[in-house]
Amino acid sequence: MKNIVFCGLSSRAFSMFIKPLMERFSTHYEITGLLDADPKRFAVCKKKFPELAHVPEFSEDAFDEMMRVSKPDIVIVAGRDDTHVAYIVKSLQWNTDVITEKPMVTTVQDANRVLEAEAKSEGKVTVAFNYRYSPFHRKIKEMILDGKIGRVTSVDLNWYIDTYHGASYFKRWNRSRQFSGGLSVHKSTHHFDLVNWWLGQNPEEVFAYGALNYYGPDSEWNPLPEEDGRFCGTCRVKEKCHYYSRWHPRSSKASIKDDHLEAGDQSSLYTAYRPDACIFDEEIDIEDTYVAAVKYDGGALLSYSIIFSAPYEGYRLTINGTKGRIESNEFHEPSRIPFAFPEQTIEYYPLFESKQTIQVVKNEGGHGGGDPLLLEDLFLGKDPLRRYDILAGAEAGAYSIAVGEGMWRSVAEKKPIGMKELFQMQNV
């Protein structure tokens, strides 16, 4: 039996880690400590999981005490993004393994701190990049490894975050770069890690454009531009807000599924934080639209775009190689898509042969059954039958962050950003 402690009692910590640990891995692990900056989160956690009523609680400045009392074998870091680095580094100083939610940290400077701490530690860092585990994404990796498309030359990845999911980031702490690193870090690092992993190459340089088009005070959808600092729960013009109306349909029977934004007043779950801030606030300092080009050290090129206010959620993917091409389109969450859409497949186009359509079987669980497989690898060890590495470590986390930070810096500085330059610049 191994001991696990949590730094950060977020909704993600509950759904992705605590619930599965209690239901599927309780014969292997025991949760022996809970740490959070907000005392109310302990009550929320223990109400949701009564079995944890006896587990000691620790404030954010009591990390060392928790390590002495709870004696963890693994520290799971799942709080606000900017808090990750301190707990990861401290855990490594205690020679303890770390599982961290993505993004690993929010800046390349902090990524350097993690890499340096890991090099001196007996512990290691694992980043919970669950997109790698999607059955479609694993199949694409296998096709590339099998040489189906030869040497990869370019990737086109267009990602669409819909008005439900996209708006949620601008209601919450994610809308501040100091907390999230911006959405090029908080969200796009998922996508960059996926491409980095598919290619088996490291990014060298990124050039990007970006803008705030849908949210913030200048949005054409803002129903009351002259008033700042509103909250959905008390807003006097919320019935005129298209984003609010999509999440709060007039029919009480209507149900929209989203794991980032919950209907109803959530303020009682926190001490001094409201996750229903106005998406048109002046304080928003991040972008909601990006277009970027990334060059890799193995010769591959990535063309990437993402918007955070699309009519539907999903992606369009093309991977070109010297011997063929892979295409796949995903439409995410049927309850949020207002039209009929096809099942996802993988289209394989050999360079001089006929097209092949590949069906992929989805399993139970999030991300097409990918989440349960990630959890098995995290808590039961790597699958001995899998012929390729899939768990992400600190270096993978660092490269994904470097592309994300390089992207927003390129937007701000209007120039290409080299990864080597970025790591050296931030190595202070």
UniProtKB/Swiss-Prot annotation:
Pfam families: GFO_IDH_MocA, GFO_IDH_MocA_C. GO terms for molecular function: nucleotide binding; oxidoreductase activity. Keywords: Oxidoreductase, Signal. SUPFAM superfamilies: Glyceraldehyde-3-phosphate dehydrogenase-like, C-terminal domain, NAD(P)-binding Rossmann-fold domains. Gene3D superfamilies: Dihydrodipicolinate Reductase, domain 2, NAD(P)-binding Rossmann-like Domain. Its EC number is 1.-.-.-. Induction: Up-regulated by growth on type I rhamnogalacturonan. Residues 1-23 form the signal peptide. InterPro entries: Gfo/Idh/MocA-like_OxRdtase_C, Gfo/Idh/MocA-like_OxRdtase_N, Gfo/Idh/MocA_Oxidoreductases, NAD(P)-bd_dom_sf. It comes from the Bacteria. The keyword tRNA processing does not apply. May play a role in the degradation of type I rhamnogalacturonan derived from plant cell walls. Belongs to the Gfo/Idh/MocA family. This is Putative oxidoreductase YteT. It comes from Bacillus subtilis (strain 168).
